[in-house]
């Protein structure tokens, strides 16, 4: 089980395509220790304020209901960190059963993703948030700019799609 921020939200900017809206879950628990963390309370995997505990199966069921309302099969897993040691087994199990196209946001690098044999995602955004070079996220018809230019984007075959925080869509 893991704790998820409530309510589960939707956003068009978080998912790495230029097509549609995505559901976004915020998982509790993070081991990255980023300076000036945006949500330091989310580092605690047992943080209870406005969160609910889910099994992977319960989360999939809840997301299926929301996907009908928002008409999407896209999901962003954020946090905290979905690939923090306290969340890895939950995330792996969830990715095995989900029908969603998943984009994972992690502060870890791609070697961490490979080391733990994370599979079943469509995209993974790697790299600690760098508050010194923060810039507002932006999504246009041509590109998506991440909040931190040191973050990298990979596809499900571990191919590097962006190394500078900007992903250009293939139109």
Predicted regions located by residue number:
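Structural recognition of alpha->loop->beta junctions
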Residues: 68, 114-133
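Cofactor-binding loop segments of dinucleotide-utilizing enzymes, especially the Rossmann-like FAD-
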Residues: 28, 80, 107
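Conserved glycine-rich "GG(E/T)P / GGGxP" loop and the immediately following alpha-helix
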Residues: 70-97, 127-130, 134-147, 154-160
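Short, surface-exposed acidic-centric catalytic microdomains
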Residues: 27-75
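Canonical radical SAM enzyme core domain
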Residues: 44-62, 83-119, 123
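Charged phosphate-binding loop/patch that engages nucleotide di/tri-phosphates or the phosphate backbone
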Residues: 152-171
């Amino acid at each position: 089980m893991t704790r998820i921020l409530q309510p589960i939200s939707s956003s068009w900017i978080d998912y790495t395509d230029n097509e549609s809206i995505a559901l976004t879950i915020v998982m509790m628990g993070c081991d990255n220790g980023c300076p000036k963390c945006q949500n330091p309370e989310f580092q605690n995997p047992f943080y209870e304020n406005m969160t609910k505990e889910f099994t992977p199966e319960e989360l999939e069921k809840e997301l299926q209901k929301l996907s009908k309302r928002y008409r999407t099969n896209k999901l962003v897993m954020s946090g905290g960190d979905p690939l923090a040691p306290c969340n890895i087994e939950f995330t792996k199990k969830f990715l095995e059963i989900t029908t969603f196209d998943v984009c994972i946001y992690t502060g870890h690098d791609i070697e961490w993703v490979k080391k733990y044999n994370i599979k079943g995602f469509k995209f993974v955004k790697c790299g600690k948030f760098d508050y010194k070079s923060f810039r507002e996220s932006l999504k246009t018809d041509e590109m998506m700019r991440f909040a931190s230019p040191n973050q990298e984007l990979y596809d499900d075959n571990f191919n590097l799609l962006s190394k500078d925080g900007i992903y250009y869509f293939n139109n």
